[in-house]
Curated annotation (Swiss-Prot):
EC number, as in UniProt: 5.3.3.2
Reported function: Involved in the biosynthesis of isoprenoids. Catalyzes the 1,3-allylic rearrangement of the homoallylic substrate isopentenyl (IPP) to its allylic isomer, dimethylallyl diphosphate (DMAPP).
Stated name of the protein: Isopentenyl-diphosphate delta-isomerase
BP-aspect Gene Ontology terms: isoprenoid biosynthetic process
Recorded family membership: Belongs to the IPP isomerase type 2 family.
Amino acid sequence: MQNEYSQFEQRKRDHIELALMPANQSSELNPFDHFSLVHEALPDLDFKDISIQSIRLKKKVEKPFIISSMTAGHSNALEINYRLMEACSKTKWAMGVGSQRRELTDKQAAFEWAPLRRDFPMVSLFSNLGIAQLIDTPISAIQRLIDTLQAEALIVHCNPLQECIQPEGTTNFQGCWTALEALVKKIASPVIIKETGCGFSKNTLLRLNNIGVAAVDVSGVGGTHWGRIEGHRANKDPIRHRTADTFRNWGIDTLQSIRNAISLNPSFEIWGSGGVRNGLDAAKLFALGATTVGFAKPMLEAALDSTGQVLTQMNTIEYELKTAMFCTGSRVLDDLKEKACP
């Protein structure tokens, strides 16, 4: 068991380093530059009256942004997460926590979040579990993860490509739909489904809508590509390493994933992430129908520096979003839905 924990910690440290490498970004597939908003030369509004309030899990929120789940369970994570949570406490951004998988077998692992929760009790946090762990974990244990964190909801991460390439990957997803449906019916917290950079098809989204998930974070191609990251880690495994290269462009991009969801007129909220680098990208997702937008890599880069850098990044993104709204004549986020170029 100790070897498993050491392996887990090393993998999480590897992920931090590799996620920042340009080669592991699918930016050449990023669709945002091919989608435009309609410019308004005479916006009949005052910039200071622009509101970026949104609805998240049926509640009004001041900021429509979430820091996507990134890291936990290793020695460097505490400082990174402290800076992220400190910034969230000042800006009212939400935050997804890193993997809580280890907490299922190591009771001490939960204490990683205890001091952060104590210092920043008002930050809206979201629990994190992978779909492979969901299959054979009792719902009572999952609820305990959420309650210990005092989380708003649970984000279940789907990452089939990553698991195929990862040297330690878990590739038994059999029973995932049955487990997910049972979770949604029985757990006391909202359930959000999130991809990890490969997006969602219309058929999968339809099934998710039918079982009643609260939200789907589409997380499409265009940003950090976990298949590429695991390919770097599998450099001593020629089969996995070559497979990673074969699938380096695999997935459905973020904008198409949002369109797939919108076309269903779903009961779940649509969240957008995957290659979102600035406030203009976020504005385009809101224009398509997203209600929450997630950022990962830009926040990780800032958090490796300081809380101040995270705050600067957040404030810049908010200002960029408001600039996009001003230049399209949009006073509230819903107005952006009329400003997408046909």
